[in-house]
Amino acid sequence: MLTARLLLPRLLCLQGRTTSYSTAAALPNPIPNPEICYNKLFINNEWHDAVSKKTFPTVNPTTGEVIGHVAEGDRADVDLAVKAAREAFRLGSPWRRMDASERGRLLNRLADLVERDRVYLASLETLDNGKPFQESYVLDLDEVIKVYRYFAGWADKWHGKTIPMDGEHFCFTRHEPVGVCGQIIPWNFPLVMQGWKLAPALATGNTVVMKVAEQTPLSALYLASLIKEAGFPPGVVNIITGYGPTAGAAIAQHMDVDKVAFTGSTEVGHLIQKAAGESNLKRVTLELGGKSPSIVLADADMEHAVDQCHEALFFNMGQCCCAGSRTFVEESIYREFLERTVEKAKQRKVGNPFELDTQQGPQVDKEQFERILGYIRLGQKEGAKLLCGGERLGERGFFIKPTVFGDVQDGMRIAKEEIFGPVQPLFKFKKIEEVIQRANNTRYGLAAAVFTRDLDKAIYFTQALQAGTVWVNTYNIVTCHTPFGGFKESGNGRELGEDGLRAYTEVKTVTIKVPEKNS
């Protein structure tokens, strides 16, 4: 049984981490029962109960049992957090007067602390989210550390320029922080999404009020303690735990929040955009849902394409906004591809996420679990051919067998709607123009992939597919160096890379009258 106690002394948490490494293997042993050190709201570098004194349970998806209870923030708590963030952002505050290079040093210090506590954080993520420890440790924590270091390097390099202009004038631009930024993150990659949003916002000098997903609050709260330990001034980062319709809506509607960044469903994205428009026209960036196509041409490396399309869908239990959730295969190789795909899905190890050879853990919660099973039943009802999986695994926790559907038609709901689970629909196509039209026939446009040995065809697909990211002969390659975001209803704006900084700065033009201008 995985259990955890609340509010234990920090020393006990440190003891749990320092003894966890295995000297016999590159991958350290996880901590199956990580102690829970923080369960309150983090406002102004202090821990607070919710104003209402309410709490809510966070559940271990591996067992379905409650790990502990966390403060349930709402509008009153958001008001306090925004007030703290606004004070930290006032002219003359320690944060506003801090050198840009010092902001970078603090971000690097935060990365150092994450690296120090990597095993503990990965274990906490696996406990609360259900993802396999090997993925939490190797993939997620690696990305978290890199994203803080990457934007630390940008802190003193993101600046304006001088502009030659007519007349007796001197002109330059300033890249100024937007101000108080509301950030709302999802449950599928809690620490990664926290880093994607915090790092560029802090590198450019903003202050933050972040609402973390109610399903996975624990790792974000622990990282808040590292923010304080790193030396960030009070009020610069504030972390609220609570529900979307209360705490999340309060951030989106708040008249003293200058920008909101949201990652989550397209449906909630519409609500965020509407709330921003009906309040103070705050800046908005949205990273939303997807129904991303993976297109396999007849000349592709078959084994590689099968492997990549498998991971494109089943990675992170299918709970990935850019999951390759529509696999289009050219007719001449469809049968062989289908057989290999089904065999690979059957071989995928589903089980305890703390076991190092587990490839797939549970879905994040009961609601998501039941939603996915509902889509599987719907696919069967609509006439898609269930080739493997299609049911829960075991009687405990929220496990679903890897599921593959064949002979899926474009009009089926499993072909059009975001399932967000381990369900891979396979489609057959004959011609390139046909599959491009079908791939683009969706309200989404987050990502796409094409598998081919023909460079001319590959380049043509990268131009024709309506998606913010197009991969060629690979999938899910997302790094802190490259911009990420969607077309159409998959969102607006970009995160990561140099483009990710633009969302957190305003460009100010300064023009000065000079008595005499010389070149």
From Swiss-Prot:
N6-acetyllysine: modified positions: 53-54, 366, 385, 401, 416, 428, 431
Domain of life: Eukaryota
Residue span of the annotated presequence: 1-19
Catalytic residues as annotated in Swiss-Prot or TrEMBL: 287, 321
Record PROSITE patterns: ALDEHYDE_DEHYDR_CYS, ALDEHYDE_DEHYDR_GLU
Pathway linked to the protein: Alcohol metabolism; ethanol degradation; acetate from ethanol: step 2/2
PTM-bearing positions, type N6-succinyllysine: 54, 83, 366, 385, 401, 416, 428
Gene Ontology CC terms: cytosol; mitochondrial matrix; mitochondrion; nucleoplasm
InterPro entries, per the entry: Ald_DH/histidinol_DH (IPR016161), Ald_DH_C (IPR016163), Ald_DH_CS_CYS (IPR016160), Ald_DH_CS_GLU (IPR029510), Ald_DH_N (IPR016162), Aldehyde_DH_dom (IPR015590)
Gene3D superfamilies in the record: Aldehyde Dehydrogenase, Chain A, domain 1 (3.40.605.10), Aldehyde Dehydrogenase, Chain A, domain 2 (3.40.309.10)
One GO term of the biological process aspect: ethanol catabolic process
UniProt EC number: 1.2.1.3
Family: Belongs to the aldehyde dehydrogenase family.
Function: ALDHs play a major role in the detoxification of alcohol-derived acetaldehyde. They are involved in the metabolism of corticosteroids, biogenic amines, neurotransmitters, and lipid peroxidation.
Protein name: Aldehyde dehydrogenase X, mitochondrial
The organism of origin for this protein: Mus musculus (Mouse)
Gene responsible for this protein: Aldh1b1
